[in-house]
Design a protein with these regions (language model features):
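Short, acidic, small-residue-rich periplasmic hinge/interaction motif at the N-terminus
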Residues: 40-42, 46-47, 99-156, 192
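C-terminal beta-signal and adjacent terminal beta-strands/loops
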Residues: 884-891, 913-963
Length: 963
């Protein structure tokens, strides 16, 4: 009887089958007792072997449960023990199952001879980057929902420096850039506010004011894999409308790579080449030790370190005086009797001399004394310090703006675009030279303990976790003014400024400096209990249910700035400072000086003594979350197609409480004729509670061998950013009367979503997929302005509010990846391949600003795409990758109300590695080869300059040793 394939191994989606050595590698198995026909398919997916058997031989048989870590062949023997099936394999890659018959020895020998080939074929072993792609595509294939995966079963095989860069190459995933690094993730055009980040399935604390996870703090060496879940399941934590990003750390008992891996190298940025006395070369180093004490106990210890030196220059507009957008403004004419013309408040140039150090440690322990119990402990610790000198130049603070016509007639040779003043010549415009220093010290600790018990058909898992993140930061500045006779300036897409007197020839009059400290602390404790009952029926395979409790408190110290006054009679001669020119902007020379020396000279020895670590917290949001779920998993046949999926519901109950200071500034006459601005602080608190029911269902239909149709539907939520739940309110002391506040009564974002994915696996590492989705989003949180009379004054207050209407987000995602050997017989192309994806997004959801012409919702990029060309053979691997994103809305800095539009960008990266020996390899990377800047504009008007930053190119070379 001819043999028919009932399952293809999920790791054998390449032209090559899994190598023979692969069959001897221990893996974790979790297969329920069930009919043999479905059991061998589950086994094929989990083992990486190709299984061949006839339907007649499998008919009517039931297999045993297999739970634990075994070699694939040992696991298969346990699976079919007592069933009457026997194993016949020709090369350790393809396994043939037949039902045992009463045969004589001769006929058995004849059968074995017919099955076995005359010669053992040559094995093809796939390692490194290419193996990572194979494993990732295998995980995607076996998952019943819509998801993307990153796999790194061997330490150090990922081509990226941080996991943020790897995530940003997945379909539909984009990353914001900070200090030249990919940082926070957006999924399917929805910004970081609605992305849930987890580590080993656990929600984690963050050092950001909101909930966002900065993925660049996780070095790729400590990550064994990552999953981006785009469709939802009841078993997943609530919180990710756009998706959930889950990083997995190394499980030492399941690890099969080298015991020791050490890596060290240099990182050089070519940005800031004109900055005086600045070394732009840093370093990276890491070491990992995975020790299997015995078959029951193993541990992993990892250490990472990095010093990043990246000098980059930027130019930023300060926004416009425009009462049509901000009702608190008062637009005036620039010529007497003329129409009102919005004018810029000014602009600034900045040079940042980044010097950042990151140290990290990871620990993992896995103990499995028998097949019925497993204990896992893991810990991640990261310490990140920034010491960044900054040179700034602020332009036009005294007469570029024209509030209420106060500077009418001051702008000669005006340039008007779209009704706005974007350029002019002004007399005696103020230039403030700023020598400043930004320091940041933050830490992150993530730890968890998990116990799992397997009792017959029951699996019980208990999990405890704790994470804490802290950040202390302070920005201090020395500020000095001079006034050139004339200044000609132009903003827009090509900003430039010229002055009649260069700053290094001027004498500066110091003004009040600034010290702006901040502090954030986030603590999150959670416990979770999960149970699963396996079934042996023809439809339901298991029932999962569980509960989780989480207690989180995020505290901030805000509004503690000071403004030291300069010493009497002090001046600063520009010639005593170092002058230098920017490479990317046509502006007056920048000035550099010794910050500590200038600080003492201008303000005195102890002028700025603020210690951010000693600041009392004055804004706190606490959150208690109860969650429970039940999910049924099934495996059946639907119209001759195997159908694997789940249906379930998750219930989420949330209580949040915000406590903070409400601040009103007012002028007080402390002595006759001596008026000072003082703040009146009132302690207030408020909160909200709600319960949400979140049903979900998904199914994967194998409509043809290697072809899957996946469907999903769910209701999902994302809790509001924690900083937007603050009760704090701050009001100005004079006109224009403005204020800002959080909103402790915010409801969560909600969405009903549908996902469809067509996936065709047509060869080794070969996939073509098209995914579509629609999300109907309600309770969207945006910033709105309202009027309120306070102390007899009409204030314009800005605060976040929930939208009363819903909107839609829809999109398509295309993925194509393959080695060229699957497309052509041309031998030269055998070791080349391509990875490409394109994401198209459309949404009718708008932010609430600017008035009359609101921006699209944060994160929506109509088009994003990746195109990677790779080569892998004989120990040499190379990748040339291009990444594109169209324009999108983003948050600027830590102010959630500061929305900007990010211009389209294309970046190009290259990486190559060579295995000198099986134990030694070298790697070279070049990032941002096109020196693509980050460019934003404000108020949804392209000519209103926001911020333009040039980070330069990054070059890395390192050495990896494995033994």
């Amino acid at each position: 009887m001819a043999l028919s394939s009932v399952a293809l191994a999920v790791s054998a989606i390449a032209v090559m089958s899994a190598p023979a050595a692969y069959a001897e590698t221990a893996r974790a198995f979790d297969i329920a007792p069930q009919p043999a026909a479905s059991a061998v398919q589950d086994f094929a997916r989990q083992s990486g072997l190709q299984i061949l058997a006839s339907g007649d031989d499998l008919e009517g048989l039931r297999t045993n449960a297999v739970k634990g870590t075994f070699t694939p062949h040992a696991a298969l023997k346990n699976l079919i023990s007592g069933t009457g099936l026997t194993i016949k394999s020709n090369d350790g890659r393809v396994v043939v199952l037949t039902r045992a018959q009463a045969q004589d020895a001769a006929s058995q020998a004849d059968t074995a001879q017919a099955v076995a080939p005359a010669e053992e074929p040559q094995e093809v072993v796939v390692v490194g980057m290419r193996r990572s792609m194979r494993d990732a595509i295998a995980q995607k294939r076996s998952h019943s929902g819509v998801a993307e995966y990153v796999s790194a079963k061997e330490i150090g095989v990922l081509p990226d420096v941080t996991i943020a860069e790897t995530l940003a190459r997945l379909p539909g995933v984009t990353a914001t850039r900070d200090r030249g690094n990919d940082s926070q993730a957006a999924i399917r055009g929805i910004g970081p506010r609605m992305v849930l980040g987890t580590i080993n399935g656990r929600e984690v604390a963050t050092s950001e004011p909101d909930r966002n996870v900065r993925w660049e703090i996780y070095p790729s060496e400590v990550v064994s894999g990552a999953a981006v879940y785009k469709s939802s399941e009841a078993r997943l934590l609530s919180g990710g409308i756009s998706g959930t990003v889950d990083l997995q750390t190394i499980r030492p008992l399941q690890y099969s790579g080298p015991e020791f891996v050490a890596r060290a190298g240099l990182v050089h940025y070519d940005g800031g080449s004109e900055f005086p006395d600045y070394d732009r070369t840093g370093w990276r180093a890491s070491g990992s030790w995975v020790k299997k004490v015995n078959d029951q106990l193993a541990f992993v210890i990892g250490l990472t370190g990095q010093n990043q030196k990246n000098g980059y220059e930027s130019f930023r507009g300060w926004g416009y005086n425009d009462d049509k957008i901000r009702s608190g403004d008062s637009t005036g004419p620039i010529v007497a009797g003329g129409p009102d013309v919005p004018t810029p408040w000014g602009a600034g140039a900045q040079a940042k001399f980044l010097d950042a150090d990151r140290l990290g440690a990871s620990v993992g322990l896995q103990y499995r004394p028998n097949e019925r119990f497993e204990l896992t402990y893991d810990l991640l610790y990261s310490k990140y310090k920034i010491d960044e000198k900054q040179n700034q130049a602020w332009y036009g603070g005294n007469n570029w703006g024209n509030w209420d016509g106060a500077n009418v007639g001051a702008h000669t040779e005006p340039v008007i675009i779209g009704g706005d003043l974007v350029g002019a010549t002004t007399a005696w415009s103020e230039i403030t030279a700023v020598v400043s220093r930004y320091q940041e010290d933050k830490s992150l600790l993530v730890t968890g303990l998990n116990g799992k018990w397997m009792l017959d058909n029951w699996t019980v898992s208990a999990d405890l976790s704790y994470s804490t993140a802290e950040r202390e930061n302070i920005w201090r500045s020395v500020q000095m003014n001079y006034y050139p006779e004339s200044m000609t300036w132009r903003l827009g897409e090509d900003p430039h400024i010229s002055v009649s007197q260069q700053p290094d020839t001027a004498t500066f009059a110091p003004e009040a400096g600034e010290a702006s400290p901040g502090r954030v602390k986030d603590e999150l404790t959670s416990g979770q209990l999960d149970l699963r009952r396996d079934f042996s029926g023809d439809f339901w395979t298991s029932l999962q249910f569980g509960a989780r409790y989480a207690d989180r408190t995020k505290s901030e110290a805000i509004g503690y700035g000071t403004n030291p006054a300069p010493l009497a009679g002090v001046t600063v001669d520009g010639s005593t400072l170092k002058a230098y020119e920017f490479k990317n902007f046509d502006i007056p020379a920048m000035l550099d000086g010794n910050f500590d020396s200038l600080l003492r000279t201008v303000y005195g020895a102890n002028a700025v003594t603020v210690n951010p670590g000693s600041l009392p917290f004055n804004a706190e949001v606490s959150e208690k979350v109860w969650e429970g779920y039940v999910q049924g998993n099934f495996d059946t046949t639907f119209i001759n197609a195997r159908a694997v999926g789940n249906v379930g519901v998750r219930v989420v109950d949330v209580e949040s409480l915000s406590t903070g200071d409400s601040t009103v500034s007012q002028w007080v006459e402390v002595t006759p004729g001596n008026w000072v601005e003082q703040s009146v602080v009132t302690r207030v608190s408020a909160g909200v509670s709600y319960t949400k029911v979140l049903p979900s269902a998904s199914v994967s239909l194998e409509v043809m061998p290697g072809t899957y149709l996946k469907l999903g539907a769910a209701r999902v939520i994302s809790r509001p950013p924690l900083n937007e739940l603050r009760v704090n309110r701050s009001l100005s002391s004079g006109a224009p009367y403005t204020g800002s506040s959080g909103n402790p009564y915010l409801k969560p974002f909600e969405a009903d979503q549908i996902d469809v994915s067509y996936e065709y696996y047509f060869g080794a590492e070969a996939l073509f997929a098209v995914a579509g989705y629609y999300k109907k989003v309600g309770n969207y949180v945006g910033y709105s302005q309202r009027s309120e009379t306070i102390n007899g004054n009409n204030y314009v207050l800005t605060s976040p509010v929930n939208s009363s209407s819903s909107g839609g987000i829809s999109g398509l995602e295309f993925t194509f990846q393959t080695p060229f050997s699957a497309l052509t017989d041309v031998a030269f192309l055998d070791n080349f391949g391509v990875y490409a994806n394109l994401a198209l997004v459309n949404s009718d959801i708008k932010e609430r600003v600017p008035n009359g012409n609101p921006m699209p919702m944060v994160g929506i990029a109509d088009q994003t795409g990746i195109f990677d060309l790779w080569y892998s053979a004989n120990g040499f691997e190379a990748r040339l990758g291009a990444k594109y994103n169209s324009e999108y809305t983003a948050l600027m800095g830590w102010d959630s109300s500061a929305l900007v539009r990010v211009r389209p960008s294309t970046t190009l990266d290259f990486s190559a590695s060579y295995a000198v020996t099986p134990a030694v390899s070298v790697r070279f990377q070049a990032g941002n080869l096109l020196d693509t800047p980050s460019e934003v504009y404000t108020d949804y008007k392209r000519h209103r300059t926001g911020d333009v930053e040039y980070y330069g190119r990054r070059f890395l070379v390192d050495l990896t040793v494995r033994f």
